């Protein structure tokens, strides 16, 4: 091992095709020998041979998602000298991304993430070929994109896309490195490795083999809603790059049994490993009984949104069940006299369904906090809810008595950070009978507190 930070940098530089002074020597007829000569005072890494480096330089790797996972993964693969790197993402850089999406810079806020990432990668290593796919991955395009690459990295954060990526990788015979991260935990898997043909039991399992059923739609939490510790997602992205290098440079004899690696920042030990089974005999995509094909994926017959129970937020509620922040403030204005004393006119109940840690950062005046997690965990069937509203059963523990009272018909408006969880909460509250059969307004503030900042209060904290 290197004895100093400087020596360690020399070792990594040799792997990446650079010398200790950050001079690239890729054009040399014997680049591996020259770089190895520069670090002869250190131990030579036995797993990184000349053959390994040549494999890396001829490899074509596709990274789906240029966010918290994709940025560190791309950074280390570019540094390792991977020949071609493709990036797929349709999002633009936001200031709230910068703490964890390490390729992006403040100057690139508003720029497409793939363009921002490639700009940084070229500064790191100008020699690889970088390919930008400036759109979210769609079923009709996935196969046409994937076919040009040797290895796929899933750096996304939603189940529907994960299943799409895995299915397409299996059907095209591409190994897949998949990772996820939320809050202080992460998961990592190498799937479809070795990438045998559909129906071949000796191939590595796919995402459907590990998770044949998606999680309940109302249990899914994004980084924007649940939060993420930057080093956690960075750790998982770096490990994706490491696994990608191992897949690229391995021989058939070196393929390891499939495993699920679980990282928890506040546990000891930090990592746990669970051995995975081989391909499921009835898997919908990689078994002999497969029903998912490239044709069903491309045509839309395999409906990933329906399979995952994901409904676009705009489809959860009717227009009359929603109100924009501007419309809300117009309907319930702050009067001149009340502004002078720092209060507002009598307003309906505002329920903020963010988790308490976010509510404590900032909150609308007179709003109350009922976290969405409490609402979902305590929700009951509609028939039982009607009984609750009539007082024949105990109230859910999270529901204040004055709001649930059968005498109360004051309007209820629900708000969250981005306008997604609030819609789910409105549906749950109506299932509980709190709309009194339509006599009481129970509505969502469209776009959440982000829209509130844009339409009502430009000074509202953004986090």
Swiss-Prot record:
Q: Does the keyword Magnesium apply?
A: no
| One GO BP | tRNA wobble position uridine thiolation
Q: What is its EC number?
A: 2.7.7.80, 2.8.1.11
Q: What is its main location?
A: cytoplasm
Q: What is annotated as the active site?
A: 223, 416
Tell me the pathway.
Answer: tRNA modification; 5-methoxycarbonylmethyl-2-thiouridine-tRNA biosynthesis; Cofactor biosynthesis; molybdopterin biosynthesis
UniProt remark on cofactor binding: Binds 1 zinc ion per subunit.
Q: Per its UniProt record, what InterPro entries does this chain match? A: MOCS3/Uba4, Rhodanese-like_dom, Rhodanese-like_dom_sf, ThiF/MoeB/HesA, ThiF_NAD_FAD-bd, Ubiquitin-activating_enz
Domain Rhodanese, chain residue ranges per copy? 344-461
Q: Where does Zn(2+) bind?
A: 206, 209, 283, 286
| Listed cofactors | Zn(2+)
The signal peptide stretch is: none
Q: Which domain of life is it from?
A: Eukaryota
Catalytic activity line of the entry: [molybdopterin-synthase sulfur-carrier protein]-C-terminal Gly-Gly + ATP + H(+) = [molybdopterin-synthase sulfur-carrier protein]-C-terminal Gly-Gly-AMP + diphosphate; [molybdopterin-synthase sulfur-carrier protein]-C-terminal Gly-Gly-AMP + S-sulfanyl-L-cysteinyl-[cysteine desulfurase] + AH2 = [molybdopterin-synthase sulfur-carrier protein]-C-terminal-Gly-aminoethanethioate + L-cysteinyl-[cysteine desulfurase] + A + AMP + 2 H(+)
Keywords for this entry? Answer: ATP-binding, Cytoplasm, Metal-binding, Molybdenum cofactor biosynthesis, Multifunctional enzyme, Nucleotide-binding, Nucleotidyltransferase, Transferase, tRNA processing, Ubl conjugation pathway, Zinc
Q: Please give the Gene Ontology molecular function terms for this protein.
A: AMPylase activity; ATP binding; identical protein binding; metal ion binding; molybdopterin-synthase adenylyltransferase activity; molybdopterin-synthase sulfurtransferase activity; thiosulfate-cyanide sulfurtransferase activity; URM1 activating enzyme activity
Under the cellular component aspect of Gene Ontology, which terms does the record hold? cytosol
UniProt subcellular location = Cytoplasm, Cytosol
Chain residues that bind ATP: 68, 89, 96-100, 113, 157-158
Q: Where are the transmembrane segments?
A: none
What this chain does, per the entry, is described as: Plays a central role in 2-thiolation of mcm(5)S(2)U at tRNA wobble positions of cytosolic tRNA(Lys), tRNA(Glu) and tRNA(Gln). Also essential during biosynthesis of the molybdenum cofactor. Acts by mediating the C-terminal thiocarboxylation of sulfur carriers urm1 and mocs2a. Its N-terminus first activates urm1 and mocs2a as acyl-adenylates (-COAMP), then the persulfide sulfur on the catalytic cysteine is transferred to urm1 and mocs2a to form thiocarboxylation (-COSH) of their C-terminus.
Q: What does the sequence similarity comment in the record state about its family? A: In the N-terminal section; belongs to the HesA/MoeB/ThiF family. UBA4 subfamily.
Q: What is this protein called?
A: Adenylyltransferase and sulfurtransferase uba4
Which organism is this protein's natural source?
Answer: Aspergillus oryzae (strain ATCC 42149 / RIB 40) (Yellow koji mold)
